[in-house]
């Protein structure tokens, strides 16, 4: 049962439930004791000149069903949560049942994962069964953000290339899946200088990747880029140690528009990948990490 703001609401709901059950029982008893009238046994209402409503008591089988329903409700509310904040004698919760089912499923799958957990990513990438399991894990847990083809979208990284903010080794990928990542670029406008300086730095950043830019503005922004170099490096190639982006390639996680660069410098950006350790076992993460690693390796081989 969901938590209430205070115990008063719990008592209120529980009271209504108990009163309703008692009311049903009283109505059933009163209706069952009604006797058939000796004369015409009608309610006295007449429709269409001669259509009358009989006033017979409830059939015994129907009254029996009502009694069974009330008894079931009493037993259910005693065993399971449903009477206000009362947890029931079985202390059952849907969360607990789900956790138990997950543990049971993991125990059943443990022998299957046991043969994979000691293998490196290179070996798993060549194992069709391991890759099939990894693909299903990806579809259930990763595709919602990164896409069914793992190519991502604006704000969600493409996992099939070799542009890794935090590293693309199997161990780094597992680390990312397990603990998640928080990418945080603070607003830098104040550190860069004037609004014109922000525009110039944006032009310089565009020039690093060979994107269309204003050459004069880019040269003016080069000196101001020094405040960005603390994270992105003096050459703009980024640093995986802090998860900063490589500004010299043609991969732009949040888009390439010039105005977009202005916004990033002015407002900063926070991107979060949630941790999956609570959803996946270490063995599952090992296989899933190998599958994700294989996606970029396939892309690299194809590019060659």
UniProtKB/Swiss-Prot annotation:
| PROSITE patterns cross-referenced by the UniProt entry | CYTC (PS51007)
Pathway-wise, it operates in: Energy metabolism; oxidative phosphorylation
- A Pfam family that this protein carries is Cytochrome_CBB3
Indicate where this protein resides in the cell.
Cell inner membrane
Q: What is this protein called?
A: Cbb3-type cytochrome c oxidase subunit CcoP
What pairs make up the disulfide bonds?
Answer: none
Q: Where is the Cytochrome c domain?
A: 129-209, 216-296
* Broad class of where this protein is predominantly found: membrane
Residues annotated as binding heme c 2 are 185, 228, 231-232
For this chain's record, the cofactor binding note is: Binds 2 heme C groups per subunit.
In what way does this protein cross or attach to the membrane? Multi-pass membrane protein
State how it assembles.
Component of the cbb3-type cytochrome c oxidase at least composed of CcoN, CcoO, CcoQ and CcoP.
Record key words, sorted: Cell inner membrane, Cell membrane, Electron transport, Heme, Hydrogen ion transport, Ion transport, Iron, Membrane, Metal-binding, Oxidoreductase, Repeat, Respiratory chain, Transmembrane, Transmembrane helix, Transport
Q: Please provide, alphabetically and separated by semicolons, the GO molecular function terms listed in this UniProt record.
A: electron transfer activity; heme binding; iron ion binding; oxidoreductase activity
- Which amino acid positions bind heme c 1, per UniProt? 142, 145-146, 273
Instruction: Family membership, please give it.
Output: Belongs to the CcoP / FixP family.
Its GO CC terms?
plasma membrane
Which InterPro entries does the record match to this protein? CcoP_N, CcoP_N_sf, Cyt_c-like_dom, Cyt_c-like_dom_sf, Cyt_C_IC, Cyt_c_oxidase_cbb3_su3, Cytochrome_c_Oxidase_Subunit
Co-factor(s): heme c
Q: What does this protein do?
A: C-type cytochrome. Part of the cbb3-type cytochrome c oxidase complex. CcoP subunit is required for transferring electrons from donor cytochrome c via its heme groups to CcoO subunit. From there, electrons are shuttled to the catalytic binuclear center of CcoN subunit where oxygen reduction takes place. The complex also functions as a proton pump.
Q: Does the keyword Cytoplasm apply?
A: no
One BP annotation, GO: proton transmembrane transport
Q: Which residue ranges run through the membrane? A: 11-31, 61-81
